[in-house]
Amino acid sequence: MTPTAQTTASARRVVFPFTAIVGQEEMKLALLLNVIDPKIGGVMIMGDRGTGKSTTIRALADLLPEIPVVANDPFNSDPSDPDLMSDEVRQKSGTGAEIPIEFKKVQMVDLPLGATEDRVCGTIDIEKALSEGVKAFEPGLLAKANRGILYVDEVNLLDDHLVDVLLDSAASGWNTVEREGISIRHPARFVLVGSGNPEEGELRPQLLDRFGMHAEIHTVKEPALRVQIVEQRSEFDQNPPTFLEKYNPEQTALQKKIVEAQKLLPEVKLDYDLRVKISEVCSELDVDGLRGDIVTNRAAKALTAYEGRTEVTVDDIRRVITLCLRHRLRKDPLESIDSGYKVEKVFARIFGVELLEDDSSQKNGAGQIKTGVR
């Protein structure tokens, strides 16, 4: 670790370790897959209050390894990938000039509910541009979030036009700011994570569809698990350094697994017949557009890479398809069946597999419980 990174690490607040989080496997899987392949398009997490949504997201950001960035660059430009460089860095790179590099933790940027569009996208100093002839740009939160995680708590309460801006940037990987005929563009490739409580209002279907995955979490009902969660939290609060030390081997192992999955991802193959069946499921469920097909393909590949394999199996698809499709189904007020269960039923029929009892148990918040990611 570099001296700069050590200083930053000591200044950071202590975060509950990701591998110590009990249950909520659906949410954890969705977050991990988005980190392995950000092109999945982010994740929307809807669930009850106090179920560990914010804690898990912050824990994930803290878990991720350091990345190389161009020193003193507000956009966290990648020194080796032109698609993730600001214009200034790309010009320097083109002339063969030496680019100073530093290592820093993956950024976790919180977007407050009261944020303005200028604060999110950045602003252009028109006066300076006209008087001095330079593009004076004040970067916003999207610039800071490049190559990191952008977290919006209570996303269902955020202004619709801001949600649109975020989703456009997340999908394209670029943010464009135009004022008075002056245009500035910079990379903004990030994992968009939104969370909310459905009791406080729903997100519009056309915006919900733009999130790659949708995880539903519920309060853990099993008394033994609740006690375990309370005890772990108490242990962490009493002595954070000792608690972190205890989980350090698991954190390091998971971090290594994520890095290896990112490297393995380009080699993962998804058989044509399986791709056809994924599209059959989407067609049968009357999913609008092709986002559902694309995201399910990407998520299945990311899961396969995470498991250390290069061939996608039916089970890989089964584990991700509900996360990728449940929020894309048309809402029928007279329909009593859960949208996730509906996806599972259609999947089981088209892929010719048995509907697992465990799948429906995911609705109780403890589905497919393991103690942490171990």
Swiss-Prot record:
Q: List, alphabetically, the InterPro entries matched.
A: AAA+_ATPase, CHLI-like, ChlI/MoxR_AAA_lid, Mg_chelatase_ATPase-isu, Mg_chelatse_chII-like_cat_dom, P-loop_NTPase
Q: Which residues bind ATP?
A: G47, D48, R49, G50, T51, G52, K53, S54
One MF term in GO for this entry?
ATP hydrolysis activity
Instruction: Kindly state which keywords UniProt assigns to this record, in alphabetical order.
Output: ATP-binding, Chlorophyll biosynthesis, Ligase, Nucleotide-binding, Photosynthesis
Whether Ligase counts among this entry's keywords is yes
A Pfam family: AAA_lid_2
Q: The organism sits in which domain of life?
A: Bacteria
Can you state which reaction this protein catalyses?
Answer: protoporphyrin IX + Mg(2+) + ATP + H2O = Mg-protoporphyrin IX + ADP + phosphate + 3 H(+)
What does the record give as its pathway? Porphyrin-containing compound metabolism; chlorophyll biosynthesis
Entry EC no(s): 6.6.1.1
One GO process term, biological-process aspect: photosynthesis
Which PANTHER family does the record cross-reference, listed alphabetically? MAGNESIUM-CHELATASE SUBUNIT CHLI, MAGNESIUM-CHELATASE SUBUNIT CHLI-2, CHLOROPLASTIC
What is the role of this chain? Involved in chlorophyll biosynthesis; introduces a magnesium ion into protoporphyrin IX to yield Mg-protoporphyrin IX.
- Family assignment from sequence similarity: Belongs to the Mg-chelatase subunits D/I family.
Q: What protein name is recorded for this chain?
A: Magnesium-chelatase subunit ChlI
Q: Which organism is it from?
A: Nostoc sp. (strain PCC 7120 / SAG 25.82 / UTEX 2576)
